[in-house]
Regions:
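Bacterial N-terminal signal peptides
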Residues: 7-19
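N-terminal acidic, glycine/proline-rich low-complexity segments
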Residues: 24-435
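N-terminal secretory signal peptides that target proteins for export/translocation
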Residues: 1-5
Length: 435
């Protein structure tokens, strides 16, 4: 694979390039993988990245596809993409006998948690969390790579129910917006399982579709027109078949794909080394701030941190007080703690000012308003790795690695031509059987 970004090469040599880009020798052990996705939940990304993933299943030993959404995503959304893959499978299998049969993929597709975790971070076992435990306990010397593209509840539940599996796991977590929806499950893992091997990618993933070489057929829209549309059922589905919330996406986003390329190129065992997946630094103490009062915009917290608000329900509160913290497009359910106080958690995915309102059946809480300001982590944060998180990495906060204000995005987009070349080569396999 070239070590510096370049232009997409002519289509005739894509197949030759693919053999190099896959990174692993034909007989080398393939990495074991479970993908946890919120496909059908909050955005297009997962459907596009599922297409990418399925085209890579000759290189990966895929052991599970879990539906772990925030929102309306369900197992059936994954199965629909597998149905599209089934139409290309006759061609794909001529290029590599390692492509799994569609029925084999359907058999490992499981339903995970459909609700956000409560304050405790865990709720109950699910088919998805139990599948993680089952796979992790198999007699296999290879680590089990968990790619979390959506809610992290099933991973949290698996660790809660079977903490013995922790040494076997290697996790790449597309955090940021997903942490925003599921802060309690994330906080449970960070505080109760700090020895977990984890890449917490909060914003670097945005380099997949922001910045880098966008000239010619490398732009998000022109690449799809030139190298995706007309490339089998998967290509046509990607180029015009992904409808979500009344809109059809026809350009690249693929925001979960850095987790896939983590295992395709570079050294997966060393997140500090450059690669298509991004380049990460040891995590500093995971920011967690607690306020026992209504906050104001003068209160500053770190972007992607866990913000906790603790308020008394007041003397006239009902026997069973209820409350929600309404902030932007979220309505966060409060939890009454042992002392009777109401607790809320929130994670800001952007560096900006936020306003919130509390809705409650407790008169002292209902209608309260407040604010806070989220700020980007200081570059110096990377100089103080947390000894309590020995196997935890996150985005490089240095200005040199920012694309605009996107932290770490340049560690991904510098490779744009290379990872798009690899994707195009895989799509070529859908067009016709191997001669």
């Amino acid at each position: 694979v070239p070590t510096t970004p370049g232009r997409i090469l002519p289509i005739l040599v894509f197949g030759l390039l693919a053999a190099c880009a896959h990174g692993a020798a034909p007989d080398s052990p393939r990495p074991r993988v479970i993908v946890s996705t919120d496909a059908g939940g909050t955005d297009f990304d997962d459907f596009q990245s599922l297409v990418h993933l399925l085209l890579c299943t000759d290189t990966l030993d895929l052991e599970g596809l879990l539906s772990s959404p925030y929102g309306g995503g369900r197992k059936e959304h994954i199965l629909r993409v597998i149905d599209v893959y089934a139409r290309d499978y006759p061609n794909l299998r001529t290029h590599s006998a390692r492509y799994p049969a569609p029925d084999a993929l359907r058999a490992i597709t499981k339903q995970g948690e459909t609700e956000v975790a409560p304050y405790a971070g865990v709720r109950r076992p699910t088919e998805g969390s139990e599948w993680i435990v089952r796979c992790a306990r198999r007699d296999d010397p290879r680590p089990l790579h968990i790619l979390v593209w959506g809610g992290i509840e099933d991973l949290a539940q698996a660790l809660h129910d079977a903490p013995d599996i922790l040494p076997k796991l290697r996790v790449y977590y597309i955090g940021g917006p997903n942490k925003k929806w599921t802060p309690d499950a994330y906080h449970y893992i960070a505080t109760r399982h700090p020895a977990l091997w984890m890449i917490e990618c909060n914003e670097s993933y945005q380099g997949w579709f922001n910045g880098g070489d966008m000239s010619g057929d490398l732009a998000n829209d022109t690449f799809v027109q030139a190298h995706v549309a007309g490339h089998g059922a998967l290509g046509d589905y990607f180029a015009g078949g992904i409808a979500f919330q009344g809109t059809t996406r026809t350009a690249i986003r693929m925001g979960d794909s850095p987790a896939v390329t983590w295992l395709l190129q570079g050294n997966p065992a060393d997140p500090t080394q450059p690669g298509w997946r991004g380049q990460f630094v040891r995590a500093w103490p995971r920011p967690y701030v607690v306020f026992d009062r209504i906050t104001t915009p003068a209160d500053r917290i770190e972007q992607f941190s866990i913000f906790e608000l603790v308020l008394p329900p007041g003397a006239n509160a009902p026997a069973q007080p209820e409350a929600r913290l309404v902030i932007e497009n979220q309505s966060l359910v409060g939890t009454v703690d042992a002392a009777g106080a109401m607790r809320f958690r929130f994670s800001p995915k952007e560096a900006k000012a936020y306003r919130y309102t509390i809705r409650s059946n407790a008169p002292a809480l209902d209608g309260l308003t407040g604010g806070l300001t989220s700020v980007q982590p200081a570059p110096e944060a990377a100089l103080r790795p947390d000894p309590q998180l020995p196997n935890w990495w996150t985005d490089d906060p240095s200005p040199a690695q920012m694309e605009g204000r996107l932290i770490g995005a340049k560690t991904v987009n510098r490779w744009r031509a290379d990872f798009l070349r690899d994707f195009a080569a895989r799509l070529e396999r859908c067009r016709a059987p191997k001669p």
